[in-house]
């Protein structure tokens, strides 16, 4: 049934929002199966999670969209466009883009876990976008399910009536039909704006090696026809719509996309930067006056250097990053050089999970071996001459004498945990310079703790540590609140007096000594012994605050002296000592890749 002839009031655009592991992708699979979009023998777990990485980690990284046809109880045929969204804190911008393309949202909560931090964060995004929210309790068939307790949490959270909550088990296929009925009856149909000038919202784009950029969009106003000349608001470029259509499991070409529908557009976009996610598409000849609202250029929060292990692979790394950046509007990168690592790129990421995923995708999909430097945030530095600069690389931090003050980004964080672990979470937060704000009790067992943190303290391994101090129960979500002044210092690592720029970090003065000591000890275990002594020093400016020494490998030069005069032995030892001294002057210490990663897991 071609979507071109469909009545707008038979279309339902909705998405699924949930915390990680609450069964969102499995629920999407079940909906596809029940509506006949997928036959049972075509099923792979998590159909919409295309990347192996998504299936392996059990997370959704990209936004996906798929069209389903469903005959409701009233005998009418409906078109359901499901837009699957990521659930992790790093991808909240992807979530907001997908939400803007919908009219309704299924809020999925695990019956065994209850409401978690990410559930609340995504719920706020959905409420801001003005979506109709259908609460769904999933995994009701598990023995440990507490359906009534979780229902009460949802009622307290969004104020719905108990009978409005749909109970399902995505795995067992229970309650899916009643969920589809709820989508049809409760999610509003799109507004009928077919007569207005074309405005379409890009919520995702992927790169096809043969066709260029494939743009996924929601038609908000007007009609898009095959062969139309279209204009992108962000860069004012004009393209011809070579192919348009809707998305089933595969792309289904069509000749018309009307207001209210979701589809794709292929128009020979060669440069990946031209298809900006969040941009508005209009017709070149009958243009809309204003772009669609609510879109911002996404700002990276965490920065890290990516360098090829083999310097010959620099161009491969550049190409791979270019292709990745089309699929991922939030990846930012600029070339940089390092004395220790050669040529590479300074990359900006949304958060730590985003960084890990980009690294894994580079290694898996693009077969590039990379070394990563310590992740850090962007500091705002006021120099003594009154100039303000942004520093995203510790080695670019000016000398201490030239700095009048340093500001770092802060985030507001909410941590939901069992009441038993409040003490552990508080202790961890205080160690990380967190400022406690207040506590909300969700029920008798679970609390929502509010803190303000320097972003630098949580980009490292805070999430892992939080999970371990709460035995896996705590979940967190954060939002950026701005820059604040801090007493920060640049900590350099010197090997035999030579600074290694890739190991520099910016730390709070109160933690500098402890960090320097741990780092030197860690590097001592990783850097292999040389033919000469190697001094590892941590220094703030010219003041060394910690030192470890790797002793030299020594050949036994006295082995062939059987007995004999002591002065002969002394002469041989002195000669060896001179040789080592000369070596030390000309020798360069090879720093293995693990040393750059050591900084990431310094406590282990």
UniProtKB/Swiss-Prot annotation:
Residues reported to bind GTP: 21-26, 138-141
Domain of life from the UniProt record: Bacteria
One Gene Ontology term, aspect cellular component: plasma membrane
Cellular compartments annotated: Cell inner membrane
Enzyme Commission (EC) number: 3.6.5.n1
Function: Required for accurate and efficient protein synthesis under certain stress conditions. May act as a fidelity factor of the translation reaction, by catalyzing a one-codon backward translocation of tRNAs on improperly translocated ribosomes. Back-translocation proceeds from a post-translocation (POST) complex to a pre-translocation (PRE) complex, thus giving elongation factor G a second chance to translocate the tRNAs correctly. Binds to ribosomes in a GTP-dependent manner.
Family: Belongs to the TRAFAC class translation factor GTPase superfamily. Classic translation factor GTPase family. LepA subfamily.
Protein name in the entry: Elongation factor 4
């Amino acid at each position: 049934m071609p979507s071109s002839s469909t009545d707008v009031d038979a279309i339902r655009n909705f998405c699924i929002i949930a915390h990680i592991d609450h069964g969102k992708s499995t629920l999407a699979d079940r909906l596809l199966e029940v509506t006949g979009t997928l036959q049972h023998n075509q099923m792979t777990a998590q159909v919409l999670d295309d990347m192996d990485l998504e299936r392996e980690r059990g997370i959704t990284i990209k936004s996906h969209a798929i069209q389903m046809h469903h005959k409701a109880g009233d005998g009418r045929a409906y078109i359901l466009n499901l837009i699957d969204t990521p659930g992790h804190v790093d991808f909240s911008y992807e979530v907001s883009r997908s939400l803007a393309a919908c009219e309704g949202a299924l809020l999925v909560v695990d019956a065994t876990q209850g409401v978690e931090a990410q559930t609340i964060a995504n719920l706020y995004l959905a409420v801001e976008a003005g979506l109709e929210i259908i609460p769904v309790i999933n995994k009701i068939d598990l023995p440990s399910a507490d359906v009534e307790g979780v229902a009460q949490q949802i009622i307290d959270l969004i104020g719905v009536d108990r009978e409005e909550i749909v109970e399902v088990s995505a795995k067992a296929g229970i309650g899916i039909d009643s969920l589809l009925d709820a989508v049809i009856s409760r999610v509003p149909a799109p507004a009928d704006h077919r007569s207005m000038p074309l405005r379409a919202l890009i919520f995702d784009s992927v790169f096809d090696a043969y066709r260029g950029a494939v743009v996924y969009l929601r038609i908000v106003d007007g009609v898009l026809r095959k062969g139309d000349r279209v204009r992108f608001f962000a860069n004012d470029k004009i393209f011809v719509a070579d192919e348009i259509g809707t998305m089933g499991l595969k792309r289904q070409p069509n000749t018309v996309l009307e207001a209210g529908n979701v589809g794709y557009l292929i128009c020979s976009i060669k440069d990946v930067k031209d298809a900006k996610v969040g941009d508005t598409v209009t017709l070149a000849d009958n243009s809309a006056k204003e772009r669609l609202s609510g879109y911002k250029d996404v700002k990276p929060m965490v920065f890290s250097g990516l360098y090829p292990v083999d310097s010959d692979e620099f161009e491969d790394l550049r190409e791979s990053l270019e292709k990745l950046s089309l699929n991922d509007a939030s990846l930012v990168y600029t070339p940089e050089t390092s004395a220790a690592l050669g040529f590479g790129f300074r990359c900006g990421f949304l958060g730590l999970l985003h960084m890990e995923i980009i690294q894994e995708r580079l290694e898996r999909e693009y077969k590039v071996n990379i070394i990563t430097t310590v992740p850090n945030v962007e500091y705002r530095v006021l120099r003594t001459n009154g100039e303000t600069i942004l520093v995203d690389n510790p080695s670019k931090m000016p000398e201490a004498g030239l700095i009048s003050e340093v500001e770092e980004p802060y985030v507001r964080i909410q941590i939901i945990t069992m009441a038993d672990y409040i003490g552990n979470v508080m202790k961890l937060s205080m160690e990380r310079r967190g400022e406690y704000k207040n506590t909300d009790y969700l029920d008798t067992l679970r609390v929502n703790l509010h803190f303000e943190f320097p972003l630098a303290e949580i980009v490292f391994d805070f999430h892992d540590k939080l999970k371990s101090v709460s035995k896996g129960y705590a979940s967190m979500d954060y939002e950026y609140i701005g820059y604040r002044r801090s007493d920060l210092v640049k900590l350099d690592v010197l090997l035999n007096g030579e600074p290694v720029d890739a190991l520099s970090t910016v730390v709070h003065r109160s933690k500098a000594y402890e960090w320097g000591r741990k780092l030197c000890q860690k590097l001592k275990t990783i850097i292999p012994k040389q033919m000469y002594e190697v001094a590892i020093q941590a220094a703030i400016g010219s003041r060394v605050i910690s030192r470890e020494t790797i002793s030299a490998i020594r050949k036994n030069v006295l082995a062939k002296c059987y007995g004999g005069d002591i002065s002969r032995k002394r002469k041989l030892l002195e000669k060896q000592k001179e040789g080592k001294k000369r070596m030390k002057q000309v020798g360069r210490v090879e720093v293995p890749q693990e040393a750059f990663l050591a900084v990431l897991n310094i406590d282990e």
